[in-house]
A protein has these predicted regions:
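Metal-dependent phosphoesterase signature
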Residues: 1-11
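Substrate-recognition element of Asp-dependent hydrolases with the DxDx(T/V) motif
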Residues: 12-41, 49-55
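Acidic, Mg2+-coordinating phosphoryl-transfer loop and its flanking beta/alpha structural elements
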Residues: 30-31, 94-135
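Histidine/lysine/aspartate-rich catalytic loop segments that bind and position anionic ligands
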Residues: 45-72
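Short, acidic/turn-prone active-site loops that include or flank metal/cofactor-
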Residues: 53-58, 118-124, 138-141
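Short, charged, surface-exposed secondary-structure boundary motifs
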Residues: 59-64, 124-132, 143-148
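A polyampholytic, Gly/Pro-enriched intrinsically disordered region
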Residues: 67-80, 137-142, 150-157
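Conserved Lys-Pro-Asp/Glu-containing loop-to-beta segment of HAD-superfamily phosphomonoesterases
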Residues: 75-105
Length: 157
């Protein structure tokens, strides 16, 4: 399957573990299928507070009968971010959203920090939509200094 052939970017597990150990909440909001996401994440799934995505619904014979679509794709990602900001009672700038596609670009409307990594359809040069951008990376750990610099900006503001 496509999910079983998908590999995580180098440094992914180390990065999410480090962020979690720092007390940072981690969420995945995706237009992909949750079963595939969980398969690709493997043991790293434990670091995420919540994963929201489309999911398969199976009939009694175990055949996929339909897909339950998440309401949190495209503009819905912005809705999710707004709901999370309210639920956690944080400033929008305390939320950092990481994405790479045009379906991720809506989140900037919440006022949260946004990082585009390995853009795939995203207008990564748009500094209104993206606080920071890593145009090409083969190591997820490249995000750590950027996240740290955003935290430092928050402390100064």
């Amino acid at each position: 399957t496509a999910a079983s052939e998908t590999k995580l970017i180098k440094g992914f597990g180390e990065t999410v573990k480090e962020l979690k150990e720092k007390g940072i909440g981690l969420y995945i909001v995706s237009g992909s299928i949750i079963e595939g996401i969980e398969l690709v994440l493997g043991e790293n799934v434990k670091y995420f507070d919540k994963i929201i995505a489309n999911h398969f619904v199976f009939d009694k014979k175990g055949v996929i009968s339909r897909i339950n679509a998440t309401k949190y794709d495209y503009e819905g990602k912005s809705v999710f971010a707004s709901e999370l900001i309210k639920k956690l009672d944080i400033s929008p700038k305390e939320l950092c959203f990481i994405g790479n596609g045009d379906n991720d670009e809506w989140v900037y409307k919440t006022g949260c920090r946004t990082i585009c990594i390995n853009p795939d359809g995203a207008d990564f040069s748009n500094t209104v939509k993206w606080s920071r951008c890593i145009q090409q990376s083969d190591d997820f750990r490249d995000l750590l200094p950027i996240i740290e610099s955003l935290e430092e900006e928050n402390e100064r503001e």
